[in-house]
């Protein structure tokens, strides 16, 4: 490692790993590869997990004439910490998978630097697992972005999005790093400008397996596709309220399978008249949210009552700026 790199990364790098909301979520068809084509608008939040990357200034691995695989490199280069960071098998961990995918791309493209520094990654977990907030995917994306800097791989955003898509369908949006219209399996991203917004987010203690939801016979998979231009022009139909054809196809399925999600959504629906917004599910659940009109978002006493009365853990969060 050169002196300037050692100096640049002598201290720990801390990054927000943000949550996301799906303002609507449509499935427009099933692909030949078994995945589903979708259309959604991702809204990134100023709330999430934090990842801390501590880089060793002297512990490096030489890549010269090395025959190590990306998997073997990861086992030598990474130390993962944090109660939620370690899974039964480290190779099933999304942070590990993200680093492995990044190194695999570097090996394939013959762009590995001569040395790679060892990195200690600590996950400070705040987002609940399996909530439709993108926590694990966001952790993976943050890992890809920061390790690309630390190891000076110099991959472009488009290349990193391609790498992220091999890790998970929601990873690309967090590499993209801004609100976007998403199509395909989530990797076809187009920037969209949205007004600043506050949200009341509820995270019921429920989790329904995503594969089970996608396989459910009552899941709608044939929503008529909309053009990017239409979605941009009709943003008023899904930003605050939710007007047909905009909806989340998972809502009837997940609320049927998970009563706690139904209860949380019902609670928010009871606040719609006061907030001038439409309550909805994000992703495939279990989290639900309600956009708040600016006139009520600043009413601290009222908002505190909503949080206190909620049937589960509740948060007030804003969009990422």
Model-derived features: where do they sit?
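ATP-binding N-lobe of GHMP and related small-molecule kinases
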Residues: 2-129, 149, 153-158, 203
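Short, conserved aromatic-histidine micro-motifs
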Residues: 62-66, 156-174, 303-321
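Short, basic/glycine-rich phosphate-binding loops at helix/coil junctions
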Residues: 61, 68-88, 143, 165, ...
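Conserved glycine-rich phosphate/nucleotide-binding loop
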Residues: 1-16, 293-321
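Glycine/serine-rich anion-binding loops at beta->alpha junctions
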Residues: 122-151, 278-292
């Amino acid at each position: 490692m050169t002196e300037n790199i050692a100096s640049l990364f002598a201290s720990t790098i801390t990054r927000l790993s943000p949550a996301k909301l799906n303002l609507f979520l449509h499935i427009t068809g099933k692909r030949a590869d078994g995945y589903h084509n979708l259309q959604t608008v991702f809204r990134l939040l100023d709330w999430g997990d934090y990842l801390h990357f501590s880089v060793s200034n002297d512990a490096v691995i030489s890549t010269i004439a090395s025959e190590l695989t990306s998997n073997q490199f990861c086992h030598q280069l990474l130390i993962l910490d944090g109660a939620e960071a370690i899974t039964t098998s480290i190779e099933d961990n999304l942070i590990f998978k993200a680093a492995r995918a990044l190194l695999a791309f570097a090996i394939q493209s013959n762009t590995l630097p001569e040395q790679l520094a060892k990195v200690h990654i600590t996950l400070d977990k705040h987002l609940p697992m399996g909530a439709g907030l993108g926590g694990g995917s966001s952790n993976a994306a943050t890992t890809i972005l920061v390790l690309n800097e630390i190891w000076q791989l110099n991959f472009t955003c488009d290349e990193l999005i391609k790498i992220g898509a091999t890790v998970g369908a929601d990873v690309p949006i967090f590499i993209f790093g801004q609100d976007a219209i998403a199509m395909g399996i989530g990797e076809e991203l187009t920037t969209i400008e949205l007004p600043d917004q506050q949200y009341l987010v509820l995270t019921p203690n429920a989790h329904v397996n995503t594969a089970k939801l996608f396989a459910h016979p009552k899941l709608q998979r044939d929503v008529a596709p909309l053009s990017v231009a239409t979605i941009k022009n009709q943003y008023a139909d899904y930003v605050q309220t939710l007007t047909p054809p905009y909806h989340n196809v998972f809502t009837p399925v997940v609320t049927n399978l998970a009563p706690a999600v139904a209860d949380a959504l019902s609670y928010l629906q009871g606040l719609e008249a006061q907030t001038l917004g439409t309550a909805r599910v994000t992703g495939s659940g279990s989290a639900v949210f309600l956009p708040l009109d600016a006139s009520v978002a600043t009413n601290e006493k009222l908002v505190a009552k909503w949080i206190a009365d909620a049937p589960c853990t509740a948060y007030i969060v804003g969009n990422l700026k």
